[in-house]
């Protein structure tokens, strides 16, 4: 039983690291104009599970990282209006900080397409990712927006309680 729990914990940590890396990659693409292939190559060789500037990064589930980044890039034209609808009308997505846009896009993609992960886990994980970059109030906004999007795509999960 302990072996199963340890295996699940390792997978969860690798997925959490993949989410953090995906948000960083999406941010880098938006701010720096890097292409997806360049970002994949850089993260594969320098970030995922390596030491960078004295910080050791957790090994990430590379396939999960690639799925989230590629999915956001492919679906961003459709994802952004979903996020805009969940935001306050006086604060559209274009006014949200770039790092938070990356968090919201990655979380929205995962909520719609990664049904293998419970919605509450997705929301919680991306709130944790947001905490790595922003203050508590902004992370609360991530929670509220992703919760709305989760209820749209995963109504069955919320109907069960």
Swiss-Prot record:
Membrane-spanning segments: none
InterPro entries associated with the record: NusB-like_sf, NusB_fam, NusB_RsmB_TIM44
Gene Ontology CC annotation, any one: cytosol
GO molecular function annotation: RNA binding
Keyword Kinase: no
An individual GO BP term: transcription antitermination
Keywords from the named record: RNA-binding, Transcription, Transcription antitermination, Transcription regulation
Short name of any one Pfam family annotated for the protein: NusB
Protein family (similarity comment): Belongs to the NusB family.
The protein's role, per its UniProt record: Involved in transcription antitermination. Required for transcription of ribosomal RNA (rRNA) genes. Binds specifically to the boxA antiterminator sequence of the ribosomal RNA (rrn) operons.
NCBIfam families referenced in this protein's UniProt entry, alphabetically: nusB
Protein name per UniProt: Transcription antitermination protein NusB
Gene symbol of the encoding locus: nusB
């Amino acid at each position: 039983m302990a072996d199963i729990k340890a295996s699940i914990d390792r997978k969860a940590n690798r997925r959490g690291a993949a989410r953090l890396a995906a948000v960083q990659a999406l941010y880098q693409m938006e701010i720096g104009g890097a292409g997806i292939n360049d970002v994949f190559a850089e993260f594969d060789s320098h970030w995922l599970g390596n030491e960078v500037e004295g910080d050791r990064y957790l090994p990430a589930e590379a396939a999960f990282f690639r799925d989230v980044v590629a999915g956001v890039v492919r679906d961003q034209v459709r994802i952004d209006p979903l996020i805009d609808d969940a935001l306050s009308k006086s604060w559209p997505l274009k006014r949200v900080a770039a790092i938070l846009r990356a968090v919201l896009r990655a979380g929205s993609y995962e909520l719609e397409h990664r049904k293998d992960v419970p919605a509450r886990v997705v929301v919680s994980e991306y709130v944790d990712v947001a905490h790595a970059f922003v203050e508590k109030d902004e992370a609360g906004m991530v929670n509220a927006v992703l919760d709305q999007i989760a209820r749209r795509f995963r109504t069955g999960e919320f109907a069960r309680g």
